[in-house]
Amino acid sequence: MLEQMGIAAKAASYKLALLSSGEKNRVLEKIADELEAQMESILSANVQDVEQARANGLSEAMLDRLTLTPARLKAIADDVRQVCNLADPVGQVIDGGLLDSGLRMERRRVPLGVVGVIYEARPNVTVDVASLCLKTGNAVILRGGKETYRTNAATVRVIQKALKACGLPEAAVQAIDNPDRSLVNEMLRMDKYIDMLIPRGGAGLHKLCREQSTIPVITGGIGVCHIFVDSSADIAPALKIIVNAKTQRPSTCNTVETLLVHQDIAERFLPALSKQMAESGVTLHGDETVMQLHGPAKLVPLKPEKLDNEFLSLDLNVVVVENMDGAIAHIREHGTQHSDAILTSDMHNAARFVNEVDSAAVYVNASTRFTDGGQFGLGAEVAVSTQKLHARGPMGLEALTTYKWIGFGDGTIRA
């Protein structure tokens, strides 16, 4: 079954690569219209998924991610229309020029071909990824989590209806709607057909893809994010930043999970932190120094293994460090190269932190919550990459392209 999907996707990718920006935008507009017109069928499938997930004991946070409402589906359709407004990178000439040989060279952006995406209980990802892939002339094979397979199947049928209405192959967007987990392992070996694989899920999924995939894999989205409160930090704005980074949307990958506090500011800062976190409903997981704190916040002893994991909840590790060296060493040992920040009034320390912390996004006196395609001015994103090849940070449209070299001659031969 999967090989046939791969063959069809590869064939579809050749047709998509030839579409103009206007043609691709018309397809996206049609998809948005069909999502609204076929809302009832998608929501009906989603109700079944939610009921099954609740019966299986899925957490309330995960159920909320899984649930679609008319308003949420309308917002998803509007997001597709927003993709139409993004600049199309395909065909862009990156650089080039006339060589001494007389050959004129261009380096031009082109689609990747076929993108594979494996993701969990987020039905919006189906549409987000499909729209970004179509905008960049790529076909896509989607494998959502078992919790959303009815919703994903219904959504992809609607997208395929729009593709067909626009005269394009339905295989441009396909979903593996069989929840059998063994199909994931089969998908990971489809390098003959899939050009890039993006897993969006937990550490276990990422580890599986890195170890088993014969396809180039872009991993990321796991955010053990840190904020370092330097000795010169201004306490009032620092607290505002920490509250935003922890409480705005705790379940996201750009939420802060560990707060590192310079020992020289700890005595003044920690009581204010406790008061602010109590008001925000955050539980502090403190080291030995922090556990001596007497304040209103709920405080529990820090477990070392928690330093390497995402909470994705209103929980925050708090560790007192001796100096900047200690903060950087901690981030290198426990971070995931996602997003890390320093709060300081010392621009020398800020520059050092930016230069020495090797993460996809590094902030000075700002919240980690900004690591997002929309916030970066990239428009929508397909994922957040924490590796260095071939994309890093929020992956917008350009990250779904590669390039080719094109040489123009006039009977030109190599001497």
UniProtKB/Swiss-Prot annotation:
EC number: 1.2.1.41
GO-annotated molecular function: glutamate-5-semialdehyde dehydrogenase activity; NADP binding
Gene Ontology annotations of biological process type: L-proline biosynthetic process
Annotated protein name in UniProt: Gamma-glutamyl phosphate reductase
Disulfide cysteine pairs (residue numbers): none
Organism of this sequence: Salmonella dublin (strain CT_02021853)
Pfam family, one: Aldedh
Signal peptide: none
Record GO cellular component, one term: cytoplasm
Family: Belongs to the gamma-glutamyl phosphate reductase family.
Record function comment: Catalyzes the NADPH-dependent reduction of L-glutamate 5-phosphate into L-glutamate 5-semialdehyde and phosphate. The product spontaneously undergoes cyclization to form 1-pyrroline-5-carboxylate.
Alphabetic keyword roster: Amino-acid biosynthesis, Cytoplasm, NADP, Oxidoreductase, Proline biosynthesis
Pathway(s) this gene product operates in, as recorded in its UniProt entry: Amino-acid biosynthesis; L-proline biosynthesis; L-glutamate 5-semialdehyde from L-glutamate: step 2/2
Reaction catalysis annotation: L-glutamate 5-semialdehyde + phosphate + NADP(+) = L-glutamyl 5-phosphate + NADPH + H(+)
Compartments it resides in: Cytoplasm
